[in-house]
Amino acid sequence: MSDERRLPSSAVGWLACGGLSLLANAWGILSVGAKQKKWKPLEFLLCTLAATHMLNVAVPIATYAVVQLRRQRPDYEWNEGLCKVFVSTFYTLTLATCFSVTSISYHRMWMVRWPVNYRLSNAKKQAVHTVMGIWMVSFILSALPAVGWHDTSERFYTHGCRFIVAEIGLGFGVCFLLLVGGSVAMGMVCTAIALFQTLATQVGHRADRRTFTVPTIVVEDAQGKRRSSIDGSEPARTSLQITGLVATIVVIYDCLMGFPVLVVSFSSLRADASAPWMALCVLWCSVTQALLLPLFLWTCDRYRADLKAVWEKCVALMANDEDSDNETSLEGSISPDMVLERSLDYSYGGDFVALDRMAKYELSALEGGLPQLYPLRPLQEDRMQYLQGAGRHRCGFPGGQPCFSPAGCSQVPPTRRFSHDDADVWAAVPLPTFLPRWSSGEDLAALAHLMLPAGSDRRRGSLLAFAEDAPPFRPRRRSAESLLSLQPSSLDGGPRHAQDSPPGSPRRRPGPGARSASVSLLPDAFALTAFEREPQALRRVPAPAQPFPAARDSAEPAEVPTPPGGRTQRSQGRRAARTHVGPLQSSLSASWGEPGGLHAAGCGSISSFLSSPSESSGYVTLHSDSLGSAS
């Protein structure tokens, strides 16, 4: 009877301590939020524990205290609904508190024992899921007594409100004991591991300064706003403080709530009865632990905030305007110009073309059949410089002195420098579509100036006449009259060398001996479109064939073209390399441009064209063993 009288007298203390606990825990939550720029898993769990304490003292304990004060009147008694609400909320919050403490110890152990895995496993998301699971399990189990899982012989809400587990039912009491006991044991084990690991790390830092640390990784957008980050290793002092805080919370909870609840529950189940001191013990332990948590947070420098910081945090929370939402969104603060300032990669026919980062490109040129990914602004200037300047630098235009300035090579677009000899490109696109892009009349004129001598017997249909009369961008004719066949020089004719020949392609197939200068615009096989009308142009027997003249290595200096009979020295290596093409030289044609054929030239050429009859049609196909050919 004396214990029952103590319940109303203790109600005032519960209300006073409960109000103080509400303010202290609210301050603790604001302090933790003010000291941290972003929510971390451990801080989130600590704030969840503080919120659980606030709910515990605000709802069930305050309700019980008010009812005990009202019971001093003889006409007031507990009703069934109010008792069920009290029992459900009290045990829900008790289990949630127990599980929250265990999850805090587990996350701390995970953080100090496996730091890299903890930071790479999205621990914050797991903490949120843990809290959701804690509240779901706690509410389901604690709501069962209110819906019928209780002792039906004498219900706990019949005479007053007896909320001890033995008064509710054996099944509920056993489940409650197992959950609380397992949670307390797991929390103690995790805390011991975390404390041991932290102390071992402290000793390791003192013994070896090269201890592994996790770096801090921050991901920001183009405007410098943080989008995501991975926290690095904590300082030794901070790590020790946080581990000590977690260990203190676990120990205090086990001493003030875990073990007392286990003892009271086990004693009531064993005696199958409840005593007034059991209710006093459980309620006072709940209020005390709710008061101690803010004090523990205050002792840690990491979570201690002054009044100014807390006030600024409150103002920021109350403002919560659209600007803060844009800062946390993924696309709110990204400028549309950023879309154009990223690296672009395009591929065409197996060739990989990497574009600059800040340049804008004309991508509509891809519709023409070639990957012409040139910069948009200097497109025409670079094109004309290459056709008019690079040719003079590399080929030696008439009227222009040959020079080897690197400007000629630097102005060549990548598609012209690296894709001369792609067989797939030649096979996929018709030949006339390449000529306006891959050659020019001035290139032909320069090549003819080097190859053909200045003789009176040269016809108007020759290559030099074509270069003199034709416009710069005249497309090649596709009939048999447009086939080029250059007559080789005599044996005593001196070879012609071209120092200013274009460089070799990176993927050019190797050839025997020194490489000859090239026509970089002629493919392996010419288009045989109009041969039905003039097949005799290909079957005309030329003059007796002689070995082609060869060009020395490209590294040797160039020589001025000489008339027939000028120089008689000949490279033995080149003579041996050209021996195997002798049988094919007898079938070379001598027609170019005009019907009737072309007289034999008096001087050799630096380009070599091999002709072989086709087994199916009998026509002759010209092949080029030149430096820049498409073979």
From Swiss-Prot:
Residues 33-41, 106-126, 184-243, 298-631 are cytoplasmic. Residues 486-518, 546-590, 603-631 are annotated as: Disordered. Pfam families: 7tm_1. GO terms for cellular component: plasma membrane. Residues 1-11, 63-84, 148-162, 265-276 are extracellular. The keyword DNA-binding does not apply. PROSITE patterns: G_PROTEIN_RECEP_F1_2. SUPFAM superfamilies: Family A G protein-coupled receptor-like. Keywords: Cell membrane, G-protein coupled receptor, Membrane, Receptor, Transducer, Transmembrane, Transmembrane helix. GO terms for molecular function: G protein-coupled receptor activity. Residues 605-617 have a biased composition (Low complexity). This is Probable G-protein coupled receptor 153. It comes from Mus musculus (Mouse). The lineage of its organism: Eukaryota, Metazoa, Chordata, Craniata, Vertebrata.
